[in-house]
Amino acid sequence: MASASYHISNLLEKMTSSDKDFRFMATNDLMTELQKDSIKLDDDSERKVVKMILKLLEDKNGEVQNLAVKCLGPLVSKVKEYQVETIVDTLCTNMLSDKEQLRDISSIGLKTVIGELPPASSGSALAANVCKKITGRLTSAIAKQEDVSVQLEALDIMADMLSRQGGLLVNFHPSILTCLLPQLTSPRLAVRKRTIIALGHLVMSCGNIVFVDLIEHLLSELSKNDSMSTTRTYIQCIAAISRQAGHRIGEYLEKIIPLVVKFCNVDDDELREYCIQAFESFVRRCPKEVYPHVSTIINICLKYLTYDPNYNYDDEDEDENAMDADGGDDDDQGSDDEYSDDDDMSWKVRRAAAKCLDAVVSTRHEMLPEFYKTVSPALISRFKEREENVKADVFHAYLSLLKQTRPVQSWLCDPDAMEQGETPLTMLQSQVPNIVKALHKQMKEKSVKTRQCCFNMLTELVNVLPGALTQHIPVLVPGIIFSLNDKSSSSNLKIDALSCLYVILCNHSPQVFHPHVQALVPPVVACVGDPFYKITSEALLVTQQLVKVIRPLDQPSSFDATPYIKDLFTCTIKRLKAADIDQEVKERAISCMGQIICNLGDNLGSDLPNTLQIFLERLKNEITRLTTVKALTLIAGSPLKIDLRPVLGEGVPILASFLRKNQRALKLGTLSALDILIKNYSDSLTAAMIDAVLDELPPLISESDMHVSQMAISFLTTLAKVYPSSLSKISGSILNELIGLVRSPLLQGGALSAMLDFFQALVVTGTNNLGYMDLLRMLTGPVYSQSTALTHKQSYYSIAKCVAALTRACPKEGPAVVGQFIQDVKNSRSTDSIRLLALLSLGEVGHHIDLSGQLELKSVILEAFSSPSEEVKSAASYALGSISVGNLPEYLPFVLQEITSQPKRQYLLLHSLKEIISSASVVGLKPYVENIWALLLKHCECAEEGTRNVVAECLGKLTLIDPETLLPRLKGYLISGSSYARSSVVTAVKFTISDHPQPIDPLLKNCIGDFLKTLEDPDLNVRRVALVTFNSAAHNKPSLIRDLLDTVLPHLYNETKVRKELIREVEMGPFKHTVDDGLDIRKAAFECMYTLLDSCLDRLDIFEFLNHVEDGLKDHYDIKMLTFLMLVRLSTLCPSAVLQRLDRLVEPLRATCTTKVKANSVKQEFEKQDELKRSAMRAVAALLTIPEAEKSPLMSEFQSQISSNPELAAIFESIQKDSSSTNLESMDTS
């Protein structure tokens, strides 16, 4: 420390030198010292350093002054608080100095100090004291109005301080407001502007009293309307407040909007511009409160979008349909753009109107149909706007409209609505000719910006409506070529033009472009040769698509591609050979050449083998190998049967080596390539090549990556079909891995299907030691030997499916094996595991093969219904149902008879019936529907809930077989006197809803409202199942319930309330335990709310929704967990609404995070509380992603609390790490 002090005192001495270079060097060295974390200053050194730095702020040399200011930043964090106060005092005094240079440097110094203070959320005393000290001095400097430049600096610093530390200055907010309000009438506009900025920052942290004072003052002054100049300022101020604190100003809009509407009619363009900007901020920041006024705002914007009093457009509307490709008379185009009038401010009004319409379109999804009637035609008619900046905003507004129309939401392309013909998509379709007509002239404008807007517009239009431009390609192609050939085009314009052309080529049929290929190929080829790599890259994508257009392989085409092959090949091969080009260009050149060979390879002659050799080189390069593998896969799959023999000998071993690389995408791509090569080139592959591949397969077949396993198994299946002689190799490690995978509980879906296909392909090859019985022993051996017990039930199902697959492939082996399984079930010495496997295997085999010839099968299965093992009983139930599917006339009447005569076995038999209804063909079941229906209705009033649920599922699935007859019958049971019957039919409806279109859908849409009326049922359980059914509809097919939300939501929200009458106390020995019978129904209601966020957000009143979310935050553990998840979703879906409610949401979150578990609680209680805290913290982290959330005083206070509590701080930190790593993972595209 002594040496540091000595070094610093040395520097201080040099700072007093008369030589400015000495002073500069010493200050620079001091700066370096202060930036070191290790530096410790004693009191004396602190005092001297502070004094010297402040003195150097007045140095004659500007460079020394600037360095001294920079020293303030690190100095503030290294000295004691009273020294910081000295610095601040001196800077404030100097700010009022007569010397302009000293004032400026002191202002910069104050901003530097404020910037270095710890944020308000850290709860730092230093920050609070410094800010309080500065505030008093600033308010007096602002209020004096003596020197405008001092005022401007003071306002600047005040705004900076309020934005960073506003929450610490709550006590000063009234005095700050008092000094700021008079500045709104300052004769200097710059002062007014900075005052507005400061007020904007003030409203984000001030208390309600100050906020009300400010708004009342503005409203009162606006009502007086003393002068046009101040009225403009007040409107600007209101817009700024709305932008910064829309969630607070909302409740005053009823008073504000009529005033702003009135001022729109005043003949003052600047005032109009500010009024419309205010509307824009209301639309974006106060979505709920502005809703009643949206139509008024749209009408005002549409009026002023065309407001151009000094210009006449009439003469421009001559016939625009003739568009020449040569663009001969372009020189005199765009002369209108040069029209300029310095006094004409009307363009600002038009621009404000366009931006405001953009805001309306972007925030009001529910008004899309209305927008296409009114806003869309108006915007299209203004594409001819003469001011370039305004035109860009008109285009942007239309782009926003198109983006809102993207059919990501199921309701936008709801088939029912489509039939009515009035959906946003159909309305857009009808306006495409007008859009093209309006863009047509703009595409040859001189302005680069305008042409870029046109390309962005066309790209988005085609993304929203693929095929929309089919009729208009002849009009658009010349405009695209114009930009590609135009010497004045910027690189970005060419890239946009190419990107647009690519999207159009991808989304229209090839025939549409055939008349234009001759015109398109030369400019695209020229762009492939462009020196700028981004243009080359985009042009290669277009070339690849053009190749598919000139010779489509998936449809007959009479177009002659021959004249274009040489040009396309030559420009691509040049890029393929180049070594020093950009990575993206390398990859796209490979993909493009792959497409050329795939579609045109039979025309390449001697160029083909040479090009394939280049591919071989690219295959050996780590950077290009994955793209090359994909290109080879494309070529190998070509119907032209390209001759790949020259590269297979060297290529296949290289591909085999890729299977051991630690790159998942490469493994998957290579397996696809090898699969297609085996299918199409088996005669060119040698046994050695295939053996090399087989050697690499065992590590790929593993439950750790089911997708890779599935691809590997599919490859083996292809091998078994095409190259059976190679399979003798697999009996060792490959087969061991396969059998191991069959026993994995994770084997299901696509991987399981691939496994079944493989066993069927393998068993018919007749390979030694891999016959039917060999494979059967391998699969079932462990169960019979009991050497290794299979722990998971799923493993038995998988083995049984494999056994059935083998038996289907070898039907002659069937009877003997089935007989053996029957004996295994009968044998009293069989273990439960053997019985389980035997029953499941009988079920799987019987599903596909008629087993009615096995006379004792029925009695053996019924006997198994009495087994003491639940798993064996369940397997017997499944087996009976599955076997019945194989011969319905034999088994179905038997099952129905047993259900009637065996009440004790009813539950298991109903499960068998469910299996039959779920799996049998509709035609096969039709004759039995009436009998099954009658039987089910007898049991739908059963008191046992498990039985009722199976009956309901059977009823639902049966209804799908004959909806016209059965759905009305189900509906009839809604008036049953039995609450059990009502709950059964409502649950049955759940099983008629699926996420893909079905014949029942239109019928269901007409009557689902009747089933949902049971949300008003007096019985609690009926209401609960109604919510579960509603949730299923909202999740799988939202179009069924969208139009019912207005009537359903009040009942749904009603079920989120805690009901005291449903809470009771139960005595358990010496303890009293509280039971809440309403918990399950509340949970069901909150689950529905969560689902609605994803499927019907545009139909929700989000503020009403948030009221119930707030209640849920104070409810039971399960419901809190659900509402925390909702908050995370809401933070991204509707941040502005959440921001308005932030203060009310923070309190319950804080309560959860600070709750302590009683010391004598059980471990489970501690774990539950810990999980609650983590979930609450995730919600807090999500809320903090909303811009400006941390500026809420309550939120910043809660943040301070989190950071000062080690336990909460640790949880919060780990959650933030998790979310950032998740974001990184989602960016990993490989």
Curated annotation (Swiss-Prot):
**GO BP terms, alphabetized:** cell differentiation; negative regulation of catalytic activity; positive regulation of RNA polymerase II transcription preinitiation complex assembly; protein ubiquitination; SCF complex assembly
Q: Pfam families, per this entry? A: HEAT_EZ (PF13513), TIP120 (PF08623)
Keyword Ion transport listed: no
List modified residues, type Phosphoserine: S335, S558
Q: Which UniProt keywords apply?
A: Acetylation, Cytoplasm, Nucleus, Phosphoprotein, Repeat, Ubl conjugation pathway
Which residues, renumbered to this chain, carry the PTM N6-acetyllysine? K55, K971
Under the GO molecular function aspect, what terms does this record hold?
A: TBP-class protein binding
* UniProt-annotated location(s): Cytoplasm; Nucleus
Q: Which residues carry this modification: N-acetylalanine?
A: A2
Q: What is one term from the GO cellular component aspect held by the record? A: cytoplasm
- Induction pattern: Repressed by miR-148a.
What ranges cover the HEAT repeats? 2-39, 44-81, 83-119, 131-165, 171-208, 210-247, 248-282, 289-366, 370-407, 424-467, 471-510, 515-552, 563-602, 606-643, 646-683, 688-725, 729-768, 770-808, 809-845, 852-889, 890-927, 928-960, 961-998, 1002-1039, 1043-1097, 1099-1133, 1140-1189
Q: Where is this region: Disordered?
A: 315-344
Describe, as the record does, how this protein assembles with itself and its partners: Interacts with TBP. Part of a complex that contains CUL1 and RBX1. Interacts with unneddylated cullins: interacts with CUL1, CUL2, CUL3, CUL4A, CUL4B and CUL5. Does not bind neddylated CUL1. Interaction with cullins is abolished in presence of COMMD1, which antagonizes with CAND1 for interacting with cullins. Interacts with ERCC6. Interacts with DCUN1D1, DCUN1D2, DCUN1D3, DCUN1D4 and DCUN1D5; these interactions are bridged by cullins and strongly inhibits the neddylation of cullins.
Function comment? Key assembly factor of SCF (SKP1-CUL1-F-box protein) E3 ubiquitin ligase complexes that promotes the exchange of the substrate-recognition F-box subunit in SCF complexes, thereby playing a key role in the cellular repertoire of SCF complexes. Acts as a F-box protein exchange factor. The exchange activity of CAND1 is coupled with cycles of neddylation conjugation: in the deneddylated state, cullin-binding CAND1 binds CUL1-RBX1, increasing dissociation of the SCF complex and promoting exchange of the F-box protein. Probably plays a similar role in other cullin-RING E3 ubiquitin ligase complexes.
Family according to the record: Belongs to the CAND family.
Look up the further comments and give them: A model has been proposed to explain the mechanisms of cullin-RING E3 ubiquitin ligase complexes assembly. According to this hypothesis, cullin-RING E3 ubiquitin ligase complexes exist in a 'stable' active state when saturated with substrate, occluding access to deneddylation by the COP9 signalosome (CSN) complex. The neddylation-conjugated cullin-RING E3 ubiquitin ligase complexes mediate ubiquitination of substrates and can recruit downstream factors involved in substrate degradation.
Record's protein name: Cullin-associated NEDD8-dissociated protein 1
Q: Which organism is it from?
A: Homo sapiens
From the UniProt record, report the name of the gene that encodes this protein. CAND1
